[in-house]
């Protein structure tokens, strides 16, 4: 597969239902099952590849997930209703009470507020650091550390994270390096630099027109 994100997305062939050059838009909230046994298998997690309810997936969001996974060169992607929806679901999937996060002090305000004001209620502690000083991060790593969180280029201060240096700290540990790549899609590929998970607010650079809200987790 090409190392160029644009080429990887361009090579994704997904046409409309009747051969349209663009994928069809799915505007249904629920989907038909011709056999009750199929629905039961989907509910019980025994069968994949079927759409159940558009809050989870539908053909349109599945195509978007494929394109974003191609762009970030990850195995899969999952879209959310907003950037913060993607960020919070990712963090809460990895961390639980008693865990600790090391995060950049210059991250997006909504993310900072979630880490600082909401996670302590769940017993999750965040250490905010100068992400450019890896010695600070190494000093804070302990047995409770579950995540190092940063932005490739911070919003809005444009501080640059050294992802390979951060990956050298988390490599061969259970700590996940989570990178918000909102400001630099198609320019930087965090996965190829050592990140474990990549997040985007689709509302910003990828949308580009300020007329839609969305988020994605790529891993």
Task: Tell me what each language-model feature is.
Residues 1-58, 66:
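N-terminal "arm"/small-domain region of PLP-dependent enzymes with the aminotransferase-like
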Residues 2, 19, 45, 71, ...:
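A generic structural signal for short, solvent-exposed coil/turn residues
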Residues 3, 20, 57-61, 108, ...:
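Generic structural signal for well-ordered, non-membrane alpha-helical segments
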Residues 3-7, 66-70, 194-200:
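Short, hydrophobic/aliphatic alpha-helical segments
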Residues 9-14, 76-219:
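Conserved PLP-enzyme active-site core in the AAT-like
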Residues 22-25, 31-36, 50, 58-61, ...:
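A broad "ordered helical/assembly scaffold" signature
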Residues 35-85, 110-117:
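Conserved N-terminal alpha-helix of the aminotransferase class I/II PLP-enzyme fold
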């Amino acid at each position: 597969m090409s190392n160029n994100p644009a080429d990887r997305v361009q090579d994704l062939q997904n046409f409309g239902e009747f051969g349209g050059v663009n994928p069809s838009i799915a505007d249904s909230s629920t989907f038909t099952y011709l056999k009750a046994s199929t629905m039961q298998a989907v509910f019980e997690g025994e069968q994949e590849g079927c759409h159940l309810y558009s809050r989870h997936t539908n053909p349109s969001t599945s195509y978007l997930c494929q394109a974003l996974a191609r762009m970030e060169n990850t195995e899969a992607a999952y879209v959310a209703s907003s950037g913060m929806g993607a960020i919070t679901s990712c963090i809460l999937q990895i961390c639980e009470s008693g865990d600790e996060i090391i995060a950049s002090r210059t991250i997006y305000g909504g993310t900072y507020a979630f880490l600082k004001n909401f996670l302590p209620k769940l017993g999750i502690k965040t250490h905010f650091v100068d992400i450019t000083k890896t010695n600070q991060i190494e000093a804070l790593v302990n047995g409770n550390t579950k995540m190092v969180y940063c932005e490739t280029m911070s919003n809005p201060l444009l501080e640059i994270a050294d992802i390979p240096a951060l990956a050298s700290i988390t490599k061969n540990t259970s700590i996940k390096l989570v990178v918000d790549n909102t400001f630099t899609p198609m320019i930087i590929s965090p996965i190829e630099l050592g990140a474990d998970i990549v997040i985007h607010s689709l509302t910003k650079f990828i949308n580009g027109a300020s007329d839609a809200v969305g988020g994605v987790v790529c891993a």
